[in-house]
C-alpha cells in the first residue's frame, strides 16, 4: 500500500477519473451542498474563498470506482476536503515525503494527519505575519 502520488500512465485516477463527467458532477454537487450558506474556507489555511479557487482532496478513494470502463463517483461528503491549489500541493508533499504517512497509514489517516500538520504550520506563519 502506498499513499504517494503516482505519475504518468500508472495513475488512471489523475489522468482519467479527475477528467470524467462523473467527477465533475460529484464535485459540482459537493460545492453546491457546501456553498448553500456562502463561501467556503480552505481546510488548510482557513481563508474563505469561492468554488473556482478551490480543489477537492480525497481523504479516501472508496467511493471512486470504474465499472465496465465507466468511472463512478460515490464519495461520501466527508471523504472530500476543499483546499486552495497551493495548500493541496503542500498536503500531498507532506504525505509523499513522510515514509510513515506514505506507506504505513490508511489514506484517510495519512490525509488527516498531514492536514492537521499543515494547519498548524500555516497558522504559525499567519501568526508571525
Predicted regions located by residue number:
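Short, charged surface segments at domain edges that flank catalytic/cofactor-binding sites
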Residues: 2-44, 66, 71-74
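A sequence-composition feature that detects small, non-aromatic residues
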Residues: 22-25, 36-39, 43-44, 73, ...
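A detector for short metal-coordination/catalytic motifs
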Residues: 78-79, 89-90, 94-129
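Residue-level marker of positions within ordered structural domains that often coincide
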Residues: 35, 47, 89
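Intrinsic-disorder/low-complexity peptide segments enriched for small residues
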Residues: 7, 16, 38, 52, ...
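Histidine-centered nuclease catalytic patch
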Residues: 43-81, 95-102
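Alpha-helical architecture
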Residues: 55-56, 86, 90
Amino acid at each position: 500500500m502506498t499513499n504517494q502520488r503516482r505519475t504518468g500512465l500508472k495513475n488512471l485516477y489523475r489522468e482519467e477519473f479527475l477528467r470524467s463527467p462523473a467527477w465533475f458532477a460529484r464535485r459540482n454537487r459537493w460545492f453546491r451542498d457546501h456553498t448553500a450558506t456562502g463561501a467556503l474556507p480552505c481546510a488548510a489555511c482557513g481563508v474563505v474563498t469561492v468554488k473556482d479557487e478551490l480543489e477537492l482532496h480525497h481523504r479516501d478513494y472508496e467511493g471512486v470506482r470504474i465499472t465496465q470502463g465507466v468511472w463512478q463517483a460515490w464519495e461520501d461528503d466527508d471523504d472530500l476536503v476543499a483546499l486552495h491549489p497551493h495548500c493541496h500541493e503542500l498536503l500531498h508533499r507532506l504525505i509523499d515525503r513522510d515514509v510513515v504517512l506514505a506507506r504505513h497509514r490508511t489514506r484517510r489517516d495519512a490525509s488527516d494527519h498531514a492536514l492537521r500538520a499543515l494547519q498548524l504550520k500555516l497558522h504559525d506563519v499567519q501568526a508571525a505575519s
